[in-house]
Amino acid sequence: MKKIILASGSPRRKELLELASIPFEIVVSEVEETIGAYSSPSDIVMSLALQKASAVAENNSDHIVLGADTIVTYESRILGKPSNEDEAKEMLQLLSGKTHEVYTGVAIISKEKTVTFYERTEVTFWELTEEEIDTYVTSKEPLDKAGSYGIQGKGSIFVQNIQGDYYSVVGLPIARLVRELKQFDIDVTHA
């Protein structure tokens, strides 16, 4: 089996690949992410995933490199990782009681081909109290997550409904990834 390299330092993406029994190594992409003039959130996440994977693939051309990126959107506003606690609180107040979209883009690169795809998931939050938001932000959990929450952690108590791929919200649409890897002659379902 060809070696897979995850171009990410995300502990969540690492855990998801391990959950799916996909053998991999980590080489963190040091690329400066740039968002150009894209027409849609799906274009943004696929472009960022491709930037990350391409940067690592330059020095690992004999392997399969996997890059991913996740953003949260609400009413055409992109909510990335908060820069501080105040911004995290603002994002959570914005999402309180509303439905937002989570986009995760994935890029898979080998010598032979490049595949990009994305998954879109709708997440609806309960109405959040100021105390709930303050307590959560104080935990520091939201500070390294797009949209300022981790659906797999303490932020799970905010979620009223989800339509789509839960694992995509965590950071990697693992079921779709397994299917896409078959194009690269990697079939983990028989591993």
UniProtKB/Swiss-Prot annotation:
Its EC number is 3.6.1.9. InterPro entries: ITPase-like_fam (IPR029001), Maf-like (IPR003697). Transmembrane segments: none annotated. Pfam families: Maf. GO terms for cellular component: cytoplasm. GO terms for molecular function: dTTP diphosphatase activity; UTP diphosphatase activity. Its cofactor is a divalent metal cation. The active site is at D69. One of its GO terms (biological process) is nucleotide metabolic process. Signal peptide: none annotated. Keywords: Cytoplasm, Hydrolase, Nucleotide metabolism. The record marks R12, T70, Q152 as: Important for substrate specificity. The keyword Aminoacyl-tRNA synthetase does not apply. It catalyses: dTTP + H2O = dTMP + diphosphate + H(+); UTP + H2O = UMP + diphosphate + H(+). It comes from the Bacteria. Belongs to the Maf family. YhdE subfamily. This is dTTP/UTP pyrophosphatase. It comes from Bacillus cereus (strain G9842).
